[in-house]
C-alpha cells in the first residue's frame, strides 16, 4: 500500500490517482478518511448522458477496480482495456474532488467495520427515493454500479436483510461483465424489475453471445459515431449514447457506445476501430 502524507497538494494527489487509474492492478491509495458520507447517490444530471434520460436518475459512483484504500477489486472482471478506458478517465469524472469522493464511498463499503453502515445508508437513501417517486406518481431510475460491478441486491440482502426489488417505484439498471449476474437475475430481468446490460471487452465475446442469447443487451464501444454499424456480429445495433437507459427499451441488441476519455487511444481491442 502507498500512504500519502497529509501535506501533499491536491493537484499532486490528482495526478497520482490518475496514474493509478491507467494501471491494471490499480495500486491502492490510503486517504485515512474517517468522515461521514452525506449522500451515496448522485443525481444523474451531473453526467452528460444520464442528464438526457427520460426518468430522473440517481447513480452510485465508487472508486473502480482496486483504486480504494484497501486494494479490494470492485470490478472483478475488468480487463486491461476496460481498466484503461474506464469512464472515470473522462469529463467531470477526472476532477480531483470527484476522485476523492469515489474513494471515500468505496472505502466506506470495503471496510469491514463500516460495510453494514454503508448498506444501511444506501437502503435509507433508496427508500426515500422510492417514497418520493410514489408520492409524485412517477418512476425513478437507479444505477448502483456507476463505476463498479457488484451484486448490490445480494449484498444488501446478506448484510441487512433488505430486498431492493421491494422498492417498486425504482427502476434499477446496470452494466456488468459478470455473466453469472445475468444468469442469476434472469427472472427479474425478464419481468422488467432489473435492466442489465452486459459489457463487451477485448476478451469476453463468448460471454457476450451467451448474454445476447438470453435476450440481454450487450454494450460495445466503437472508436467514433461513424464506426457504429447497423449490424454487429449478426445482431441489430442501437445507439447507446442517446440516453443512459436505452437498455430498457430493447432486448437482445448491441448498444453501441462512442469511445470517451482515455478510451479514444485504446488499442487493446476493447474499443473497435
Q: Could you tell me what each predicted segment is?
A:
Residues 1-273:
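Class I S-adenosyl-L-methionine
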